[in-house]
Regions:
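Catalytic cores of secreted/periplasmic lytic hydrolases that degrade extracellular macromolecules
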Residues: 1-102
């Protein structure tokens, strides 16, 4: 995905998530760009997972608990129903795990 298209596609949702979780949306957008290779990762394209988030933990408001495994020996990863859910769960995780850094 072209970088410009990535920004145009995801920035509105990132901005909304940034406001909700009190994270600078530019920082959040940069983080998901790095994590997904500008939207090119299989987890992002096929499963709306914007941070390589593993399938551990309890379901959240944004993740219904769906897990996928990319290969027989890989970890399980979270699969989201849509991009908004994946971005919001990434922001939630950043805020809850790294609150002072955000």
């Amino acid at each position: 995905m072209l970088k410009e298209i990535f920004v145009q596609t995801y920035y509105p949702t990132v901005k909304e998530a940034g406001l909700k979780f009190k994270i600078n949306p530019v920082v959040l957008l940069a983080q998901i760009a790095i994590e997904t290779g500008w939207g090119e990762s299989r987890l992002c394209m096929d499963h709306n997972n914007f941070g390589g988030l593993t399938g551990f933990g309890k379901p959240t408001d944004y993740w219904p608990g769906t897990k996928i495994q990319l290969s027989e020996k890989s970890l399980t990863f979270r699969s989201y129903p849509d991009a908004r859910s994946g971005i919001f769960d990434m922001a939630r995780l950043l805020r809850s795990s790294y609150g002072n850094a955000c």
